[in-house]
């Protein structure tokens, strides 16, 4: 991401050029290249990058109540369930059955799995930069090559985490629609083929922990998967 430019609104080097406009991944401003008039927008690419930051922040912090972890471990002990058998489907079912959540929250599920498996995520500064870089390319790829602009975060982040050796344990929750599961897998395989042919920048922008934890006044995003 060596082509990031200076944003006149938030004063960060966060402008990405796309077709006839530029958008800032930090403050969400969009600049028309013709007249440079900025405006606030829910531009889906920048929104997805903001949401990714929220996910990384969640995984690097402890927001889940310890009581939930203790209760889940008690259920595992009672039913002789190993931590290696714990996946997103199991955790999600536990949360819903015990009325811990009233909507799907894969970030919470990810965090709980991380606690149960007692795994320290390999998310140092270089890994954060790598994950964000791949995710950015994935967003643009989906925008240009898929009919829907929505992204199954739990599915694709699991793939990216595995690819970058962050973790192999955060398995996504499968959905009942097998066609959708197969579609996500096909998108991922096509994306990998696309990236193999694409000339990648040798210079990766340094996001790091400061980017993940800085507060720009955005509200926490919780999307249903």
UniProtKB/Swiss-Prot annotation:
Segments forming unnamed zinc fingers: 7-27
Keyword Zinc: yes
InterPro entries: Poxvirus_VLTF3 (IPR007031), VLTF-3_Zn_ribbon (IPR014900)
The keyword Zinc is assigned to this record: yes
Entry GO MF terms: zinc ion binding
One BP term from GO: regulation of viral transcription
Alphabetical UniProt keywords: Activator, Late protein, Metal-binding, Transcription, Transcription regulation, Zinc, Zinc-finger
Subunit and interaction comment: Interacts with the late transcription elongation factor H5/VLTF-4. Interacts with the late transcription factors VLTF-1.
Function of the protein: Acts with RNA polymerase to initiate transcription from late gene promoters.
Similarity field: Belongs to the nucleo-cytoplasmic large DNA viruses (NCLDVs) VLTF-3 family.
Record protein name field: Viral late gene transcription factor 3
Organism: Fowlpox virus (strain NVSL)
Gene behind this protein: VLTF3
């Amino acid at each position: 991401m060596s082509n990031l430019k200076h944003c006149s609104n938030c004063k960060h080097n966060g402008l990405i050029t796309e077709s006839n406009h530029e958008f800032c991944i930090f403050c969400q401003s969009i600049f028309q290249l013709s007249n440079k008039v900025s405006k606030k927008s829910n531009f889906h690419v920048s929104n997805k990058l903001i949401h990714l930051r929220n996910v990384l922040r969640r995984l690097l912090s402890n927001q889940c109540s310890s009581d939930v972890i203790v209760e889940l471990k008690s259920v595992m002990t009672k039913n002789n369930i190993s931590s290696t058998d714990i996946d997103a489907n199991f955790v999600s079912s536990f949360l819903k059955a015990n009325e811990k959540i009233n909507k799907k929250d894969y970030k919470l599920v990810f965090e709980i799995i991380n606690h149960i498996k007692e795994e320290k995520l390999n998310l140092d500064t270089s890994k954060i930069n790598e994950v964000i870089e791949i995710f950015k390319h994935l967003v643009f790829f989906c925008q240009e090559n898929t009919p829907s602009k929505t992204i199954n975060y739990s599915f694709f982040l699991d793939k990216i985490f595995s690819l970058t050796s962050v973790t192999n344990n955060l398995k996504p929750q499968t959905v009942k629609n097998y066609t959708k599961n197969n579609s996500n897998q096909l998108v991922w395989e096509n994306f990998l083929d696309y990236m193999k042919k694409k000339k990648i920048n040798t210079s990766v922008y340094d996001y790091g922990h400061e980017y993940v934890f800085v507060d720009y006044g955005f509200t926490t995003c919780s999307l249903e998967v």
